Amino acid sequence: MSKGTPSLGKRHNKSHVLCNRCGKRSFHVQKKTCASCGYPAAKLRSHNWATKAKRRRTTGTGRMAYLKHVSRRFKNGFQTGVAKPQSA
């Protein structure tokens, strides 16, 4: 049996399964870490050499249900809904 490409066809076991955090098939079974997002580390895995990957998962690629309204509220001084007292 050869060492290189022919022996790669003999592999059957999965080394990566689905990750609980990012959902990709990048969670290494033996290492117990995700190759994509770094789970179970507290902070998300990101590197400067992977600019495209950063662009895919950065702020603004999702719904931004809260953040998209912040700039407008900042412009108005974060009003609370209570009218200002009238000064005579």
Curated annotation (Swiss-Prot):
PROSITE patterns: RIBOSOMAL_L37E. Signal peptide: none annotated. Keywords: Metal-binding, Ribonucleoprotein, Ribosomal protein, RNA-binding, rRNA-binding, Zinc, Zinc-finger. It comes from the Eukaryota. A zinc finger (C4-type) spans 19-37. Zn(2+) binds at C19, C22, C34, C37. One of its GO terms (biological process) is translation. The keyword rRNA-binding applies. GO terms for molecular function: rRNA binding; structural constituent of ribosome; zinc ion binding. It holds the Pfam family Ribosomal_L37e. Binds 1 zinc ion per subunit. This is Large ribosomal subunit protein eL37. It comes from Debaryomyces hansenii (strain ATCC 36239 / CBS 767 / BCRC 21394 / JCM 1990 / NBRC 0083 / IGC 2968) (Yeast). The gene is RPL37.
